Curated annotation (Swiss-Prot):
Pathway entry: Glycolipid biosynthesis; lipid IV(A) biosynthesis; lipid IV(A) from (3R)-3-hydroxytetradecanoyl-[acyl-carrier-protein] and UDP-N-acetyl-alpha-D-glucosamine: step 1/6
Protein name (record): Acyl-[acyl-carrier-protein]--UDP-N-acetylglucosamine O-acyltransferase
Organism, as annotated: Neisseria gonorrhoeae (strain ATCC 700825 / FA 1090)
Major localization listed first in the record, in broad terms: cytoplasm
NCBIfam families per the UniProt record, alphabetical: lipid_A_lpxA, PRK05289.1
Length: 258
């Protein structure tokens, strides 16, 4: 059963599945679709061509699907797509995509987005991530699965953060962060392996050791980057835990943190 507070303003063209709850003074626009059992708190605003999946919890004052902060945007019907089972806390802002990007901003499943986080246009966020308070992504950023962003992390346009990576408090990410690695600092630098995150997600000691050797190959052995990359890609053909480096290196355009 859908429960809508009488003060909520919902366009008649919006589509709300069964079990959706909408709090007081929330505003939902005409091109919004919301999946079953999603709960939206008071004073939220959901606009644009926005599709939200099932079993999400969206807290008060979230702003989802507003136009991108891009001067080139001309009211094109770009999209925001949010998956299932996400927690989106207070004062978060997720913008629509742009026609000069991929045309949509996408968030996967089971993500935990804390208060005041910002996802700009054309960002792609995977599954099972954690964004601590005030983490912000500039446009066209890609974040992999199981990533943890420390509070006040800022990620520059077009950067890529690999699966299981982690950033420290107030990290300024201006280059790509490889999978499994930690990054810290105003101009983020490599800060070791996210070994605790790997253990919590079921990686064996042998697998963690293999990734640690990749870290040493990239940063501690004095090997030129292209040679180190080729060596890692060779190992990735036979070691499953290293397979994520294949896509990461193929898609990386800004170079990696050094």
């Amino acid at each position: 059963m859908t429960l809508i507070h009488p003060t909520a303003v919902i366009d008649p063209k919006a589509e709300l599945d069964s079990g959706v709850k909408v709090g007081a003074y929330t505003v939902i626009g005409p091109n919004v679709r919301i999946g079953a059992n999603t709960e939206i708190g008071p004073h939220a605003v959901i606009n644009g061509h926005t599709t939200i999946g099932e079993n999400n919890r969206i807290f008060q004052f979230a702003s989802l699907g507003e136009i991108p902060q891009d001067k080139k945007y001309r009211d094109e019907p770009t999209k925001l797509i949010i998956g299932n089972g996400n927690t989106i806390r207070e004062f978060t802002t997720f913008n629509l995509g742009t026609v000069t990007g991929i045309g949509e901003t996408r968030i996967g499943d089971d993500n935990w987005i804390m208060a005041y986080c910002h996802l700009a246009h054309d960002c792609v966020v995977g599954n099972h991530t954690i964004f601590a308070n005030n983490a912000s992504l500039a446009g066209h950023v890609t974040v992999g699965d199981y990533v943890v962003l420390g509070g006040y992390t800022l990620v520059f346009q077009f950067c890529r953060i690999g699966d299981y990576a982690m950033t420290a408090f107030a990290a300024g990410v201006h280059k790509d962060v490889p999978p499994y690695f930690m990054a810290s600092g105003y101009r983020a630098e490599p800060a070791g392996l996210n070994s605790e995150g790997m253990r919590r997600n079921g990686f064996t000691a042998e697998q963690i050791s293999a990734v640690k050797d990749v870290y040493k190959t990239l940063y501690h052995r004095g090997i030129p980057f292209e040679e180190a990359k080729a060596d890692i890609l060779r190992r990735a053909e036979t070691q499953a835990e290293l397979a994520v480096f294949q896509d990461f290196f193929a898609q990386s355009t800004r170079g990696i943190i050094r």
